[in-house]
Regions:
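Sec-dependent N-terminal signal peptides of Gram-positive bacterial secreted proteins and lipoproteins
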Residues: 4-23
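N-terminal secretory/targeting leader peptides
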Residues: 25-129, 139, 148-341
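Signature of the catalytic double-stranded beta-helix
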Residues: 133-145
């Protein structure tokens, strides 16, 4: 495998903080690196002890094992490499090797990825098992393939989780309780339309801006999976959580397309195996953190409100009928063929 490493290294544009800069010369040779290990910079917006990072750490160990130490990951949490849109742009241009991002900004990445908005519909999945069946199947692969030719190779669906609502004003049990409240959403038109349908005022903000916005009262609340609310310590400034499970939110592992296409068969096998097993590990870690998050935050004084979900489902039906959102109806039908079984 080491004899084949030159091809891979000729394609990797590594900008390391504590190592020589490696870049490809006009003749395809690698300049500025004397290391036998190729390091892929992978960025995410989440906390170092969260399920994204712990999943990447699992993949890191597997990649080192399967490549005999010739490939590894350098993990940058807490938006150290920028917000999710910034990182996707950087990966597509080759100035960053990899990222793990939520699906929120993907529909606006390019015309080809506009169909990803179907995954943002409220109450699309009843449970994680339904989501896995769809995302790991034909529909998921069709969506991943829409990145082909964009500079990004989308490798698979990891997990963010079901998104619940936090605020620091009152218990919210019904959509009527949301009237007039300013709720931070992802920069995603389906999410914004959903909160408008619920009577709230959606305020799109990048993840890195949320905490200060909540502290300063710029927004009244936000929504995220319990695992994120816990590990990002959102509960320190938001003391009410409503268990609405409004959206199932996956995340996607991405690598620069030229780097991936430059792998030898042996390298690709090692990388793909590590990524697939890393995905399984990350999903398990997400469930582990999520299962204990409520009890941990209740012990810290957070008030949880269980809701009649049927009321919320009814309140967002207009989103499914909103033709301005450009939802691919054939893809929605394919998803519902699984979820309605």
């Amino acid at each position: 495998m080491k004899k084949k490493l030159a091809l891979l290294m000729a394609l990797v544009l590594v900008i390391a903080l504590c190592a020589p800069v490696a870049h490809a010369a006009d003749d395809g040779s690698l300049l500025g690196s004397d290391s036998a290990t190729v390091r892929f910079k992978v960025g995410t917006t989440t906390a170092p002890d969260g399920h994204y990072v712990r999943g990447l750490q699992a993949m890191q160990k597997l990649l080192e094992e399967y490549s005999n130490g010739e490939m590894t990951l350098d993990i940058y949490p807490n938006s150290a490499l920028g917000n999710e849109s910034d990182m996707m742009d950087a990966v597509s241009m080759g100035t960053q090797e990899m990222c793990l991002v939520s699906t929120g900004p993907i529909p606006s990445f390019s015309k080809k990825t506009a169909n990803w908005g179907v995954l943002d519909l409220p109450y699309l999945f009843k449970n994680a098992e339904q989501a896995y069946e769809v995302l790991d199947g034909e529909v998921g692969q069709t969506l991943l393939d829409e990145f082909d030719g964009s500079g990004i190779k989308a490798l698979g669906f990891w997990e963010n989780g079901f998104r619940d609502l936090t605020n620091d004003k009152k218990e919210i049990a019904t959509p009527a309780d949301l009237a007039g409240m300013k709720i931070r959403t992802m920069e995603n038109k389906v999410h914004m339309a959903t909160y408008t349908a619920l009577g709230a005022n959606p305020s799109p903000l990048a993840w890195g801006e949320i905490f200060s916005a909540l502290q300063q009262g710029t927004v009244d609340g936000q929504e995220n999976p319990l695992a994120i609310i816990l590990t990002a310590k959102v509960y320190e400034v938001q003391h009410y959580i409503s268990m609405i499970d409004l959206f199932y939110s996956p995340c996607v592992l991405m690598i620069n397309e030229d780097i991936y296409n430059g792998f030898t068969a042996e390298q690709k096998e090692a990388f793909d195996k590590a990524a697939e097993e890393g995905k399984a590990a990350e999903r398990a870690i997400s469930k582990e953190i999520g299962d204990s998050a409520r009890a941990e935050m209740e012990a810290l004084g957070v008030t949880f409100t269980d809701v009649d979900q049927d009321v919320w489902v009814e309140a967002v039906q207009s989103v499914y009928d909103d033709t301005s959102l450009g939802i691919d109806q054939d893809m929605l039908a394919a998803i519902q063929a699984v979820t309605d079984m």
